[in-house]
Structure formats: structure tokens, C-alpha cells
Amino acid sequence: LSAALLKIQDPASGLWYQVPNFPGRKGNYLEASASNMFIYAFAKGARKGYLPSSYVATAQKAYAGALKHFITTDAAGFIHLEKTVSVGGLGGTPYRDGSYEYYLSEPLRQDDLKGVGPFILASLEMEIAKELPIGKGKKVVLDYFFNHETKNGQRFHYTWEDRKDSGFHLWGIQFEQLGASLDTLSVSPTHENLKGASVYIIVDPDSPKETAKPNYMNAKAADEIEAWVKAGGNLILLANDTTNCEIPQFNILAHRFGIEFVAPNLNFVQGKNWEQGAVYIPAGTPIFSPLKKIYIKEITQLKLSKTAKSILKLQGADVMAVAQVGKGKVYALGDPWLYNEYVNNRRTPLEFENFQAGKKLAEFLLK
């Protein structure tokens, strides 16, 4: 289909006519809704690897054409999308006969949502394309070994594919939109099976409360991960509150980098009293500046030594840290705070900037 669309693309504007097999014919016009859908499909298809990379240039040329031919600005400075056909179909009363004349007879509408929606999606792809070099060729691996919770026979809780509140689907999209690829590791980590990874994320290791037979962190696995970090790997350690996470064994690994997850937990939240989970980010905070406010509840504190440095405190306690280890780095926090529930702002007020923080952290790890 994409190859066929290239054959009927207007070479001058890069766009598509309302009746695309009759370009330049009297009365025919460049139409916004279809053109914007094709731009979006080409750009995203190439980014995701479904289409050849040559479609990027095709989409960019078409988008430039859309800005030139479809976008206007009124006297008040508001931007509008022009040339979206209001409707198209066959049959009915009055009878729609599918002729050339019929398809040109339907009225055009300014800012019709059928055109605006695809234009927004196409515009987002153009913005995403600017940041793809950040993570190009890099792989982000999410642990599925130490965290292996199932429900009704299905894996869930902090997984890339989980689109419900409990998953990391949105954070995964942020990594992909920075040019990185996603992967998982369902076996014990080794320097060998981590060799192709730029980032390795371990979240909320299982306790017997969550999994019948947990896979515990041990000295051998810690040796392998430490060697990988020293060689240039970037490690994320996200614990959970002490009642919902296996902490003692997890600390076998954390200790290698001067980090220890310790009680008591902070930021208990009652019901929808969101402010009880507020964490304010001081100006100049590494990684997250200029963000001001994020939401994290029931955080496990950190005890730091060696090269580990605190980058955020809460109630006087260290809660977020970074350690430079050899050629790599480690980021640690005592909560899985970037899962869908707390980045999509469907429940939490918009003043909480977890979504933006997730992108900031991804950029830090990929650069």
C-alpha cells in the first residue's frame, strides 16, 4: 500500500489529491485529511522499522507541503487547518454515485477533526524524529527474572507490554521515541547476555508474598551486573516500599555501588490526598531540572557510601541517588514511580510532572 501511495504522490507539493489518480485535473485539489494520515503512517512506519528508512524523507517532504498548503493564520493569530473534505461515501439519498464530480462536490471544512487529528500525529512524528539520534543503536532491557509476577496466568506489573496502570508501557514509548529499542531479560543476568544492552532496569524484586518461587538476587548475579556496569552499562535500581518488595537480597547488588535501601518508608498517601505524595525538585537538581514537582508514594530511603551521591532528599532523607562506577552509572530510587498510573495524569493532578521526569531520566541514561 505504501509503495502504491508513492506512485500517486504529487511530486511538486509532496501531498495527495482528493482524487489521487487524476492529479492536476480541473477542480481537483490537495486534500488535508488523507495527506496527513499518509505522512503520519510513513514517518511512524519508518521509525518503527515497518517501512524502509527512505520513507522518512518522503514524510518530511510531504509535511513541508502540508505546512505550506494547509496551514493558515487568522487575524487574531490563531492557526487553522484548511482543505479537509467534510465527507465521502456511496449510495444514500441523494444518491452518491462515486464519480469524479461527486468526490469534488462535497464541501471542505476548516479545522475538521478528521484532518486535525492526523495532522497532530504527523507533527508529533516530526518532533520525535529530531530526538531519535539520542538513543540510536541503543537497547533498553527490562528485567523479567527478579520481577516475575503473574495474574490469571499472565505476566503483569512493571512490564513493557502492560498498558494498564501497573505497566511501564508509556515509559517504554519514551525510550523508543528517543531512538532506543526495547528488550527484556527473563533469565539471570550475565555479562554475556547483557552485552548488547545500554540500559538495564531492575524493578521491585519479588518476595514470597508476590511469587511462589521468587528469583532472589545473589552474589554471582551481582558480580555479573557489576562487571557490566564497569564496562559502560547504565543500571536502574527501583525498589518499592518495604512491605511490597524483597529488600535484603536486592541490597546485595545495591551495596556494590554504595547504595542500600532502608526503612522506614516515607510519603504515605491516604486515598486521593495527592499532595501527601508530592516530592519537590529544587532548582538545579541533576537530571530533572527544571521540573518542579513529582509524585512518589511510600518511598524506601537510601543509605549512601562510596561514589553514590544523593540528588534528591525528602524530609531530610536521601531518596534518589546516582553512582558513577567505572565507565557506567547507576540510578537508584526506592519506588517504581514511572509506571503508567503515575505518568498518564488520569488520576493525579497535572501539576505532577512524572511523565516529563520519565523522559528526562531516559535521556540521562541514553546520552
Regions found by a protein language model. Name each.
Residues 1, 5, 37, 41, ...:
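Alpha-helical packing segments of well-folded alpha/beta enzyme cores
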Residues 23-31, 56, 190, 196:
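A glycine-rich, coil/turn loop motif that links secondary-structure elements
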Residues 1-23, 27:
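Oxyanion-binding "anion nests"
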Residues 6-11, 68-76, 263:
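Secretory-pathway/luminal and periplasmic proteins that interact with or process carbohydrate-rich
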Residues 27-35, 108-116, 164, 350-354:
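Aromatic-acidic/polar surface patches that form glycan- and anion
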Residues 130-367:
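Short, surface-exposed patches at the edges or C-terminal ends of soluble domains, predominantly
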Residues 30, 39, 47-131:
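CBM-like carbohydrate-recognition segments
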Residues 24-35, 44, 240-243:
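Short, surface-exposed loop/turn motifs that are enriched in glycine and acidic residues
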